[in-house]
Amino acid sequence: MSMTDLLSAEDIKKAIGAFTAADSFDHKKFFQMVGLKKKSADDVKKVFHILDKDKSGFIEEDELGSILKGFSSDARDLSAKETKTLMAAGDKDGDGKIGVEEFSTLVAES
């Protein structure tokens, strides 16, 4: 399954384009722009599993840094600052990684 099976390619392209400048990434705006906020809980979980590149059941910091590439291969990596901000927002239990429920909460709070 690819991201475009779940989300509009046009919405993804617009959202990626909105955050091309370094340190401009805003996960709340991004999740809204790609249409993730409007998706069912099942679809949000499917997106999580696409972003969980190593299939560990968690999105770790290195995967988080390349989260935009999970939506579009030609997107940029997040800066260290953006990655840490996103991890702080999503890692509710403080274990240094984001689980599927934490990701679902992160999207719901967008």
Curated annotation (Swiss-Prot):
Annotated residues for binding of Ca(2+) 1: 52, 54, 56, 58, 60, 63
Xref: SUPFAM superfamilies: EF-hand (SSF47473)
Gene name for this UniProt entry: Pvalb
Species, as recorded: Rattus norvegicus
Binding sites annotated in the UniProt record for Ca(2+) 2: 91, 93, 95, 97, 102
GO biological process terms, semicolon-separated: cochlea development; excitatory chemical synaptic transmission; gene expression; inhibitory chemical synaptic transmission
PTM-bearing positions, type Phosphoserine: 2, 8, 24, 66
Gene3D superfamilies, sorted: EF-hand
SMART domains attached to this UniProt entry: EFh
Swiss-Prot/TrEMBL keywords: Acetylation, Calcium, Metal-binding, Muscle protein, Phosphoprotein, Repeat
Molecular function via GO: calcium ion binding; identical protein binding; protein-containing complex binding
Protein name, as recorded: Parvalbumin alpha
Outcome after substituting residue 76 to A: No effect in the overall structure of the protein
Domain comment, as recorded: AB domain, comprising of helices A and B, is involved in structural stabilization, protecting the hydrophobic core of the protein. It is required for high-affinity binding of Ca(2+) and for Mg(2+)-binding.
Keyword Isomerase part of the UniProt annotation: no
